[in-house]
Amino acid sequence: LFGSFRFDEEKISFGELGKTEKASLVTYSLSKTMLRLTKNVALPTLRCFSSRITIDNINQKIRTADYAVRGEVVIRAIEIDNEMKKGKKFPFDSLLYCNVGNPQAIKQKPITFLREVLCITSWPEVADKHPEMFHPDALQRAKELLAANPGGSGAYSNTAGVPKVCEDVAKYIEKRDGFPCDPANIFLTNGASQGIQDTLKLLIDKPTDCILIPIPQYPLYSASIHIFGGQYEPYYLNEKNDWALDAKDIEKSIQSARAKGLTVKAIAAVNPGNPTGKCFSRQNIEDICKICARENIVILADEVYQENIYRPGDKFISFKKVMSELKLNCQLVSFHSTSKGYWGECGRRGGYLEMVNFPNDVRAELYKLLSICCCSNVDGQYTMDVMINPPKPGDASYELFEKEKNGILDSLKIRAKKLSTALNKLDGVSCLSVDGALYTYFRLTMPPKAIEAAKKMGKAADLMYCMDLLNEAGVVCVPGSGFGQEEGTYHVRSTILPPMNEIDQVVERMNNFHKKWMAKYQ
């Protein structure tokens, strides 16, 4: 009766406190009804009515959500880093972070043209005082962006974003796919993650609403769906077939979800793949589009790694291009980001989403949802404009831009090859080639003793492996159990982002650690 009642001190009188810390609750008011108690009430009883926040009365969906990319291994890495700064000794002299796709955190240099533009948009006076510091095309782009948002980067933009940037994104999509794109369907977001989360908020209405997610998956999806009160149903990518998908498996997942009484609202498709490092074939994309058109399921096309394709002859194909060529009336939301590719501007939080084949009233509701946060950050919007509209042949910055871009992409290809080749030489390790994105995702054949030891610790065996790799070798990776995997299999995700000299260290440390670890559990 009283569990949710907040006491008003003016309506409560207490007797004297005795040694037993009891108070006599004389009167209080509840719902306009005066009640009287004459018995003593222990203070702990009074405290139970308090509104003080504890771990037990916060949103339990947040408490039970998992996000392995910044989970237990990373928390321990932060502890080690702090201990090292205080002088504590470890078997290594530095940590090698291979856990998250955050390029500039591990020494990737930013693209000069972008930084020149952002410097000017943040401090326009510097261009007046020292124009010689900047390339002419950077000066011109900054001038255009400042004019497009009155007040500059320190002022709110329109909810959907600076109109010029939305228009430039639409032109970029039209050029990429060869089909029209309406700027009214473009929404600029704080990274792709916000766009994905807000789209999920829009779609999930009831506890029985379901999103299909790939396994292995990027845990943004499972965590967000859980917190927003929906359900997810896995569809498995086939490791034996280069992490390709099978249309029959998607259809089985749809049937499985519906058999549970769930309403399948959407399917998440990540291409190129995180964590797999693989690209969907055109046939894979066609299969998803056809199924979704037939079943009235929204496609959530996570395409943030579209510039990260390494296999010779491969080229990115968007879901919008395929469904348009097939003349399918699918409902599609596609996402892109400034954080990946060769830009690596994670901290700028630039992103966009495009809604395709949604009615205007639904689009208006997404606009309202985004309006609650006013707009995405304007520096991120400017970054997006530069990313989708970089220097062109003949521009003053073009030669330097091409040199920087190709240098980054070529280096990523080399590092991907070097790391995957080294991993395949380890006993019990199988690593498919890295054809896209920023990760190797290797499979571990665990000794039975290792699996048993992990069970005794209450941990997944690949989590135990990653914790040992961190504590003994200083390499920070993410266990496959955090992405989902077929029962009885174990995986580890490592980025390919450490610079070349550190990739060599990663290879050496992992090689030495792995040999000792496997010998320990043979």
Predicted regions and their residues:
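N-terminal mitochondrial targeting presequence
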Residues: 21-53
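N-terminal "arm"/small-domain region of PLP-dependent enzymes with the aminotransferase-like
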Residues: 48-160, 171, 297, 381, ...
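Conserved core segment of the aminotransferase class I/II
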Residues: 49-51, 55, 113-116, 136-144, ...
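Conserved PLP-binding catalytic core of the aspartate aminotransferase-like
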Residues: 56, 104-107, 112, 401-413, ...
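Generic structural signal for small/hydrophobic residues in well-ordered secondary structure
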Residues: 73, 98, 169, 186, ...
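Short beta-strand
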Residues: 88-89, 95-97, 335, 430-435, ...
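Conserved PLP-binding active-site segment of the aspartate aminotransferase-like
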Residues: 99, 438-457, 473-507
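Conserved core of the PLP fold type I
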Residues: 112, 118-294, 306-329, 333-334, ...
